[in-house]
Structures are given as C-alpha cells and as structure tokens.
Amino acid sequence: MDFSGKNVWVTGAGKGIGYATALAFVEAGAKVTGFDQAFAQEQYPFATEVMDVADAAQVAQVCQRLLAETERLDVLVNAAGILRMGATDQLSKEDWQQTFAVNVGGAFNLFQQTMNQFRRQRGGAIVTVASDAAHTPRIGMSAYGASKAALKSLALSVGLELAGSGVRCNVVSPGSTDTDMQR
C-alpha cells in the first residue's frame, strides 16, 4: 500500500509492535510520528515525541501542539502497552492500576485528543492493538488480559461513535509476539 503524504501517529513506537508498525508506515511513504516514554536509539527513521500515554495532561499538550501544525491526521495506531505478570492474588495494586492506565487509559487519552480532528476532516483510520489475551485467559496475565478486553470494547465504541464521520476504526488482536515485552 502507498501511504505517501499521509500523516500517521503510532504510540508505543520506541520498540516492539509499535516500532515495527511505525517502520512499515515509513517504508510505505508515510510521514510518521512515533510516541513513547523513551526511545532507546539515537536515530529513528521517523519523528519521535517523548510522551507518557497514561498522562492525560501530557497527551493533551503534545497532541494539541502537533494537531495545530498539520491539516490532517490520516492514521492513529494505538500500540502502547505494558505487561505486568503475576498471579491475581499476588499482583500489586500498582501493577494492576498501571496496566490499565497505559493499556486502556493511553488509548482513551489519545481518542479524547484526536476524535474531533477525525470528525472535522471527515475521514481517517484508527487501529488499536489489543491482544488475543482479551478473550483467551492465561495464567499470570489477569491484569493484561482484562486491560486488553477493556481496550477492545473502548476501541469498538469509538468506532461506532466515528462511523458517521467516515472514520474507520479497527482492532487487531495479535497472539504472543517475540518482543522485549514477552521476554
């Protein structure tokens, strides 16, 4: 596919699925902005923005600045995510809350800042990376699975809310993927 001239945002772009997705869009000709808490490499083949998707105020500030600099946002990919392992009764409250803050809250924060832009331009696409853990339980992954199930529902609801504006919203649910998060 040719994405020449398309403006694409990818969260979680510092590594893993987010990085691979951002790279694929660059190779397809898109102008990509990647968001993450940190970027390990010095140079990336796309613009980078250090941003904690779980921090609503920071997301608002960064998104408002970037949206003021562009006419369109063609694609948003919500790929930021974390995995905190542990049996449910041994998982810390902080791990539970942080998993939801990033995996669900991060997408929520991006939706809040971008939905009006997608409505105004009457088009675009949003892809949200959930997980097959949303519907296939795994030992030690209760927080992750529950957060991805919530994320899937959130993304599908946003899809219904934006359908009348010609915005496509899809959810992908990959299985185990060989990334740093899984190692």
Locate predicted features.
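Active-site helix of classical SDR
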Residues: 111, 147
